[in-house]
Curated annotation (Swiss-Prot):
InterPro entries, A to Z: DUF480, WH-like_DNA-bd_sf, WH_DNA-bd_sf
Residues that span the membrane, as ranges: none
Name by which UniProt lists this protein: UPF0502 protein Shal_1801
Organism of origin: Shewanella halifaxensis (strain HAW-EB4)
Stored PANTHER family: UPF0502 PROTEIN YCEH
Family: Belongs to the UPF0502 family.
HAMAP family according to UniProt: UPF0502
Length: 215
């Protein structure tokens, strides 16, 4: 499933409002445009016109990721997502996973700490380790939904991004040659890291067997 940045924003808004303001969901074009252009909880802040949002909705309809709904006696068309957790969706997410994906769609790359702080209206994470566990689950899927980015200079924590929109080559984290056990187990930083770990274990076992045979 590939999304443009505008499609990601629209899907993110629909996911968010379904959870935080269910009484207003599905959303009209006007409400959806306002949600896309919010000054808070959005990175980057956009200024989309209703026609731009409508064009994005048309594209999402072609991808079968949204559906229209008209109330009885109302001419206002409202929109709901088919992105995940519906009978029409291949993608099924737990509450914790949905919260993380929603935040990454709406606010771009974030650290586990930022995700925990910003997720209170979507899902209650008791600590950062729960966020990290959720990120690892999303990263270990057959088709990963998130990835770990290279740590920014001067930053203590690395950020994660969603994989529904195109990834720039500069964002991809290369696995260090001296990868630590913590980074491997906690962040599952790709196939190369896992292969390196297995090779190290094989080398240790070979050394142990050799030591036993030499006795």
């Amino acid at each position: 499933m590939e999304l443009t940045p505008h499609e990601a924003r629209v899907i993110g808004v629909l996911l968010e409002k379904e959870i935080t303001t269910p009484e207003q969901y599905p959303l009209s074009l006007n409400s959806l445009t306002s949600g896309c252009n919010q000054k808070t909880s959005r990175e980057p802040v956009l200024s989309l016109s209703e026609s731009e949002v409508q064009n994005t909705l048309d594209d999402l309809t072609k991808k079968r990721l949204i559906s229209e709904q008209s109330g009885f006696g109302s001419r206002v068309v409202k929109y709901k997502h088919r992105f995940c957790n519906t009978e029409f969706s291949d993608l099924q997410l737990k509450s914790s996973e949905l919260a993380v994906v929603c935040l990454l769609l709406l606010r771009g790359p974030q650290t586990p700490g930022e995700l925990r702080t910003r997720s209170n209206r979507l899902h209650e994470f008791h600590d950062v380790s729960e966020v990290e566990a959720t990120l690892n689950e999303l990263q270990r899927r057959e088709s990963p939904l998130v990835m770990l980015l290279a740590k920014e200079p001067g930053k203590r924590e690395a950020r994660y991004r969603q994989l529904f929109t195109e990834v720039d080559d500069t964002e991809i984290q290369s696995t260090p040659a001296q990868s630590t056990e913590y980074s491997i187990t906690q962040h599952a930083s790709g196939l190369e890291a896992r292969v390196n770990t297995l090779e190290q274990q094989v080398a240790e076992l070979t050394e142990q067997i050799k030591h036993l045979l030499d006795r």
